[in-house]
Amino acid sequence: MNTTAMNTTAPRQAPFGSVLTDSMAIAWYRDGKWLADRLEQTGALPIHPAAHALHYGSSCFEGFKAYRRADGGIHVFRLDKHIERLMQSARALALPAPDPAQVARMVLSLVERCRRDVPEAPGALYLRPVLFGTVPNIGAAGTAASEACLVVLASPVWDYFAGGLKPLRIFVQLAARTAPNLGMVKTGGNYAAALGPTLAARREYRADQVLFCPGGEVQETGAANFLLIRGKKILTRSLDATFLHGVTRDSLLTLARARGYDVSERIVTLDETLAWIAQPDGEAALSGTAAVLTGVGTLIHAGREHRVGNGEVGPETQALRAALIAVQRGESPDEFGWQTPVR
């Protein structure tokens, strides 16, 4: 599939993120300062094979969406929060962090350029800023990248669950997903570290994801946060440096509290999780940008399959997902100032 061009007739069954718009936003960091950003045709970049990011992993990224409302207006969801997390990741990796205002300008100018490519609901325009070190030096393992590039890509995406909501099968692994001090950094190395266990679990157990539980404490999956739900109660791990602070997670918990849910954030053990899901009304779910909230039907641990509740996507999971999607699409009031309009 041609991933460098897109039009409104692009196939809706295309894999998530595989179709890109014709334009991208780009800015370079050189001589100690960020240069002016600009819009360019999406395509190859002049990156040296000795670039710092290719050898020493100095790269981080974000992922969020712009939505077309029923009235035709376009809004970016939680732009400020995602830029804040990008800055946090850049600092953790000793990358030169651009001014947040410049990042916002790049995102909004790109969405404005690509207005025609923003699908109507239930689709959206997925936005991917990526920041990486470009200085060509294969001997710079102990040195921060003195040159860098920031690119913002845009990808029209459609309904993640076009075939209907299906419960996930999750394999439990008693190990950490990544180095504890890097868990909250959105960097490619963390996803690569989770890929081997995830592929093995898929091959051996038909699992969709791996839930990492180092020392018997529930952490996260390879690409999503983990929540337990029962009635109007939600239990999830409290934030620390060992796992990614999901913006979708934050949005869901904020909405849930506003709607009267009892939300608890603390250390959650695997034993507690297994007891929770054994209840008839027990639910478990994964939260993330792509799917918003996905129900878990089975946890696989120690050679056993543990059914979550009745094994289907639970009613509270569906209700919370629908509530957040309604806010994202502008169908419900923006109580928390999460929407940034595209002029």
Each language-model region and where it sits:
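Short secondary-structure junctions
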Residues: 115-123
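Helix-start/capping segments and mature chain N-termini
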Residues: 1-113, 130-343
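Extended, Lys/Arg-enriched charged tracts that mediate electrostatic binding to polyanionic substrates
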Residues: 122-132
